[in-house]
């Protein structure tokens, strides 16, 4: 895209360019993401489809096509941890200071039923798969998926293709087989796999009832759950077409006849994704890896976060069909949910945030009770870092339960939405109350400290996780940054609503430290570039002394942007912090933290490292089928490698956000354009990117010349 000097010409060209994008949407080639078959390692190597409730992963090999089908609302809601009066903040601080490890940990235990196997917590359930046997010697060779239409293809050795589509309108997945290729679907519920005998049967589950073949051309199964409404899967085939649907409720799946045909589902998919890309941000980068990371990642974000769908947890709707998903498939609020939803902001897909926000706000009675027991107030909200879709604490990790930045981060997300979308009514009716209640908990935690305020005790996420003494400390920089972000947002929100800000919020801004500061950062030898300047600590007196996957002590840089670079020695402190962080390296990193690192490099003005981090994320944490993993798939970048068993969507969505941040990034509230784009990128551009002031902008950098203009 060529930059034009005159704004009128630029606007016309952008309109034309948007039309071209909707038709072609090529990225750096034809826009299609490719797969080589066989893909038999695990389901996450497959092509991904979703309608925001049901997820389908298409994989397999030879003459066997596998459709792993999951649902984002498949919970066994039994168990969980209710907040107790003994889990009050004063008691926790006192026990920790006294070294009473067993007493403190005992506050956060519950008793599981006999034969339960593991902690007594809610968890997400697998649903099952449909296995399609191809006839006539057909062999799968490769697959493609177009992120701009949502349509996929599977290629056979003879050149024929199986077409794939999923519709958010019809809530159905469809296949169209080529002429002359016979196919035979078979239903395989999760209860037919080893997970049933090992984990589900001891917990009181019955086997799903399969009804394949009772009606010609139809099949599926229904599954009665011990404590939740039943689930079902059904498929119907006619001629060359086969349609798969899922649902919940007492009505048997046999009664659910798929009515849509492939043509309808195909056209609905194309129409939906055309609107999605027209409404949101688009980029052009000269790096084919990053172009694919953005295009396919934004597609998967849009697929799993439908405005009329179910809020996405760690894996969205893409759950394995033969095991219980890692970490219960829960909502992790100490970074993971935030990363999953981060593309909504710069990407301009604000409506995709609303199911998440409405779910959290529906928990307010429970969160208020949590705050009452945690710190003795009637007007607070306390959100544990790990919960199910009803806000029930998934317990066992005490530092996560008391991590109040989980609530503060979501409050800041809600206010960020208000700024981007201009939704003052939502601020007035819901968000402002949640922000105030969240701040009230912080205010109850604070204590006087020689004329300043302090947080007596708190966690820095995942720092020394199981170490009773070292996992928490005084004035965690992560908590300080979250508290300041919330205070500033509340002050701004009050102004927006025509109210006077609470004096206590102003006091937080004046007297609470922005971060815990070390006298110096030590490490390495003089010969190898020892870092000796001052920097940000994890806690008071505790610096970053090893590789760490949660860059929480730098949260005041990103995501909270609370550290003013021009204030006092802050610039030097940030330089020392960045140098020490670089020194500690990537040896204990996991997938979701690498895109965050890219954004931190962008913030520091290190464009080469920002881009390289995203390439490393793709190279080390994604499998051959572009599945996003928690642990490294390949050696050489980190020691956190346990194979391909843990898929999470946080890294993939955060990578999309990091690509946008290469081009549009805020420092001290001021937007910097192309800060993360290397000089050797001679032509790079973005379209329709959203800013916090409600504007949409497009821009380009051609041969070093930057031009940016408003879109609407």
Describe each PLM feature range.
Residues 23-330, 349-354, 360-369, 498, ...:
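Acidic/polar, glycine-enriched structural segments that form the non-catalytic walls/loops
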Residues 112-135, 649-692, 696:
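Catalytic cores of secreted or luminal carbohydrate-active enzymes
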Residues 158-163, 167-172, 411-441:
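A conserved hydrophobic secondary-structure block that centers on an alpha-helix together
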């Amino acid at each position: 895209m060529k930059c034009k000097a005159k704004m009128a010409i630029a606007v016309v060209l952008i309109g034309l360019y948007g039309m071209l994008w909707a038709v072609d949407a090529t990225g750096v080639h034809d826009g299609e993401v490719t797969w080589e078959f066989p893909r038999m390692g695990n389901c996450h190597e497959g092509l991904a489809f979703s309608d925001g409730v049901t997820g389908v992963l298409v994989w397999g090999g030879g003459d066997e096509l596998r459709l792993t089908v999951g649902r984002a609302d498949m919970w066994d809601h039994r168990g969980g941890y209710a907040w107790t009066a003994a889990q009050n903040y004063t008691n926790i601080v006192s026990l920790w200071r006294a070294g009473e490890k067993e007493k403190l940990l005992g506050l956060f235990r519950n008793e599981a039923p006999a034969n339960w196997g593991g902690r007594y917590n809610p968890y997400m359930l697998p649903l099952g798969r449909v296995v399609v046997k191809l006839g006539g010697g057909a062999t799968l060779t490769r697959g493609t998926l177009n992120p701009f239409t949502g349509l996929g293809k599977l290629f056979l050795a003879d050149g024929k293709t199986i077409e794939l589509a999923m519709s958010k309108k019809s809530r159905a997945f469809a296949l169209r087989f080529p002429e002359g290729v016979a196919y035979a679907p078979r239903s395989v519920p999760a209860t037919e796999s080893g997970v049933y005998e090992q984990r589900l049967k001891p917990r009181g589950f019955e086997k799903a009832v399969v009804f394949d073949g009772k009606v010609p051309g139809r099949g599926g199964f229904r599954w009665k759950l011990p404590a939740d409404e039943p689930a079902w899967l059904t498929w119907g085939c006619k001629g060359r077409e086969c349609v798969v649907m899922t649902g919940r409720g007492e009505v048997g799946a046999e009664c659910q006849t798929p009515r849509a045909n492939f043509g309808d589902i195909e056209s609905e998919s194309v129409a939906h994704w055309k609107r999605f890309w027209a409404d949101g941000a688009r980029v052009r980068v000269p790096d084919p890896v990053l172009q694919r990371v953005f295009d396919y990642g934004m597609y998967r974000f849009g697929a799993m976060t439908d405005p009329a769908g179910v809020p996405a947890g760690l894996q969205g709707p893409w759950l394995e069909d033969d095991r219980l998903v890692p970490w219960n498939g829960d909502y992790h609020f100490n970074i993971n949910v935030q990363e999953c939803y981060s593309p909504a902001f710069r990407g301009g897909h604000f409506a995709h945030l609303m199911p998440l926000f409405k779910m959290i706000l529906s928990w307010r009675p429970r969160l208020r009770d949590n705050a009452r027991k945690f710190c003795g107030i009637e007007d607070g909200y306390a959100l544990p870092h790990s919960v199910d879709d009803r806000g029930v604490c998934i317990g066992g990790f005490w530092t996560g339960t008391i991590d109040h930045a989980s609530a503060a981060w979501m409050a800041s997300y809600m206010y960020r939405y208000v700024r981007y979308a201009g939704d003052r009514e939502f601020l007035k009716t819901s968000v402002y109350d949640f922000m105030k209640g969240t701040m009230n908990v912080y205010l109850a935690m604070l204590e006087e400290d020689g004329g300043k305020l302090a947080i007596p005790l708190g966690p820095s996420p995942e720092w020394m996780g199981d170490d009773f003494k070292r996992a928490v400390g005084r004035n965690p920089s992560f908590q300080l940054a979250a508290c300041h972000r919330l205070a500033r947002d509340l002050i701004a929100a009050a102004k927006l609503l025509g109210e006077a800000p609470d004096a206590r919020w102003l006091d937080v801004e004046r007297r609470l430290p922005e971060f815990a500061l070390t006298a110096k950062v030590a490490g390495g030898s003089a010969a190898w570039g020892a870092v000796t300047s001052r920097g940000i600590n994890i806690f008071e007196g505790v610096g970053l002394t090893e590789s760490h996957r949660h860059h929480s002590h730098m949260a005041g840089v990103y995501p909270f942007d609370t550290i003013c670079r021009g204030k006092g020695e802050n610039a030097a402190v940030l330089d020392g912090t960045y140098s020490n962080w670089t020194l500690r390296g990537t040896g204990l990193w996991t997938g979701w933290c690498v895109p965050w690192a890219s954004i931190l490099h962008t913030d520091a003005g290190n464009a080469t490292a920002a881009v390289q981090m995203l390439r490393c994320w793709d190279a080390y944490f994604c499998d051959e089928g572009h599945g996003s993993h928690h642990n490294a798939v390949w050696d050489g970048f980190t020691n956190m490698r346990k194979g391909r068993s843990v898929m999470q969507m946080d890294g993939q969505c955060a990578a999309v956000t990091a690509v946008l941040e290469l081009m549009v990034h805020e420092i001290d509230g001021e937007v910097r354009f192309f800060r993360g784009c290397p000089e050797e990128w001679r032509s790079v551009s973005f379209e329709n990117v959203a800013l916090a002031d409600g504007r949409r902008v497009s821009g380009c950098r051609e041969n070093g010349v930057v031009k940016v203009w408003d879109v609407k």
